[in-house]
């Protein structure tokens, strides 16, 4: 059997979180449950992340909980490409088997009981995580590094491209406000608290 392996290597050293027990099969499929938010009936979001930005997504979950009382379920997505391949295969099968019970894609299966809007953040352009939009049935927001490349510290670059923990938190709060689950004043308060300039140029334009 001929097998081809590939590895994506990032230029950042950090301690990788421990793999959740029983997640091996889902990791291979491209999406796995990393950590569930707390229980309760308050606002809840689903946070998806991949690569080095997943650390910012984890930090955003803590900000949402501690600063705004919002619970976040965390999902690791090591392969959005694998997720869209699976989804398209399921779409094709459902198209060709109209008299049988429709199958669910891996994304749909993982999120079928999830509550709240879904926010995805990656170190790639937004189109990367946009690929799975047809399989996300809740409101879906994608964050990515669209724009011209430049040199600076990781912290400043992630702020510039609007993919750091504060921008992930803001996107989650805005999605909750759009869904009517929190007041829009909360989003405005987050802009002030995290010193996010509403007149900041779009990274695509500078």
Give, region by region, the residue ranges found by the protein language model:
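Thiamine diphosphate
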Residues: 1-206
């Amino acid at each position: 059997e001929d097998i081809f392996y590939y590895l994506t290597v990032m230029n950042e050293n950090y301690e990788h979180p421990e793999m959740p027990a029983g997640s091996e099969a889902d990791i291979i499929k491209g999406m796995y449950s990393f950590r569930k938010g707390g229980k309760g009936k308050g606002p809840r979001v689903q946070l998806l992340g991949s690569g080095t930005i997943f650390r910012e997504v984890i930090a955003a979950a803590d900000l949402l909980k501690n600063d705004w009382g919002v619970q976040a379920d965390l999902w690791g997505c090591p392969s959005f490409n694998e997720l869209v391949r699976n989804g398209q295969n399921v779409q094709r099968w459902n198209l060709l088997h109209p008299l049988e019970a429709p199958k669910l894609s891996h994304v749909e299966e993982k999120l079928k009981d999830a509550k709240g809007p879904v926010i995805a953040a990656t170190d790639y352009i937004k189109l990367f995580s946009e690929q799975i939009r047809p399989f996300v049935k809740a409101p879906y927001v994608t964050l990515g590094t669209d724009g011209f490349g430049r040199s600076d510290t990781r912290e400043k670059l992630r702020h510039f491209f609007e993919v750091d923990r504060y921008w992930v938190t803001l996107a989650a709060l805005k999605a909750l406000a759009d869904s009517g689950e929190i007041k829009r004043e909360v989003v405005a308060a987050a802009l002030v608290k995290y010193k996010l300039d509403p007149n900041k140029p779009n990274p695509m334009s500078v």
